[in-house]
Amino acid sequence: MVQSTRRLIIKSAAATVGAMSIAPSLFAQSGPVRVGYAIARTGPWTGGAQVSQEPNYLLWAEQQNAMGGISVKGVKRPIELISYDDRSDIETCVRTYEKLMGSDKVDLVLPPWGSNANFAVAPLANRYQYPFLAPTALSKKLVEMRLPYFFLLLQQPAPMTTALVDMLKASGAKTLACIYVDDLFGLENYAALKV
């Protein structure tokens, strides 16, 4: 647990530094760094999004602001989070990210929760040239898209499920039952498990 937390902190710090090096609009301003995202606060994705993702965004902004904000060219700037409820709906999620990157013109974006939402939004991040680091998406299809502004942070289905099957076999398991969600994440993991 400590090792994964340490890795997450290191990845987050690297992502922030990388994003800041790519986002020139940050250097042209002196006000707050405007960071936008859409996340499920209602609907079926809420459980995952509100446990594994949005609390981390809020904690990051709170802790950075407590230290004076993000240092941009030696000047500390506070973080201003601009967030919306994507209502666990792909169309709402896509429209919201178009607004954040297109008309709101936030300095940085944080990704939505889940493989499906990231799959839908990743091409937008590429079009608007916003670095997009996805901590809650895994999909071979996302890898195959080869989007230069989109970065997956999770292991992909085949290596994960192979390790799971090996562990279960080593512990003497003979049968495995699997319940999965009928979406990109569930289908790809189940397909990898069947191989």
Regions found by a protein language model. Give the residues of each.
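N-terminal secretory signal peptides and thylakoid transit peptides that target proteins
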Residues: 1-17
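C-terminal segment of N-terminal export signals and the immediately downstream linker at the start
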Residues: 24-38
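Extracytoplasmic "Venus flytrap"
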Residues: 36-60, 84-90, 113-116, 181-187
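Sec/Tat-exported extracytoplasmic proteins
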Residues: 39-42, 60-68, 101-104, 113, ...
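Short, solvent-exposed loop/turn and secondary-structure capping segments
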Residues: 46-50, 93-94, 121-122, 144
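Extracytoplasmic ligand/sensor domains, especially the bilobed periplasmic-binding protein
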Residues: 55, 106-195
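Signal peptide-proximal N-terminal region
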Residues: 55-80
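Short, well-structured alpha-helical segments in soluble
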Residues: 87-105, 167
